[in-house]
Amino acid sequence: MLFAQKSNQVALFNGKDLTGWNSYIGPPLDDAGKQLSDIPVGLNHDPNHVFTVVDLNGENVIHISGENWGCIYTPKEYSDFHLHLMFKWGKLFWGPKKGKKMDSGVLYFSVGENGADYGAWMRSQEFQVEQGNCGDYWGVAGGMETIPVIKKSDSEYVYSPNGVMTVFSAKSSVGRHCIKQGDAENLTGEWNTLDLYCHGDTSVQMINGKVMMVLYHSSQDDNGKISPLTKGKIQLQSEGAEIFYKNIFVEPLKAIPAEYLQAK
């Protein structure tokens, strides 16, 4: 399927190679997820070719093998933007993810040092990309969001537009994970679209045209100091599973469309 680029969109993937991206890979892990070394593989050093560009059915796409935990990320920071991309799962599992749901993620508003979370990722807000859970939220290394939710169980909270506004962070009583509403993911092996709208401290996470969650008051906890988190780099995770990405575009955003903020 051909993708029509808008005039104000900037392609983050040139369709040829990984020019315009940095890579970072954390310490190697055993099958239980334990670090085999304290030393990360490092910045722009990818001996296992975790991040490559491959020809898939006649189309060049980004291939993330998942063999090591890490990411590719934009050197540039973004605020007030719309990010669009497409992804689909491969078949490979590695290490602690063997036999589990295939997992990746789009980490936005990424700031600070590489490896702040699990030795692999910067502080950020995570748009979860995981089989059956695409659209969930995770706060990464101090990322915090306020989300309207209903309580599903003692430990699970689900996004609901009319729910109780609740702060999600590693230090809050509800934790740093919020479950999206509904399920819009296509069958494994099919391409999915991901759209992320961010303006100010508000974000909308969408899968295949459906609003999964609206998030408010994006902020960060830096050793007890709380401050806004509204600008940062974009990371694409490698987290133990094979995944492909393509058609990655970002464009400036003057306002989040009202219909997405009000979606039920």
Named regions from a protein language model:
Residues 5-264:
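Carbohydrate-interacting regions of secretory-pathway proteins
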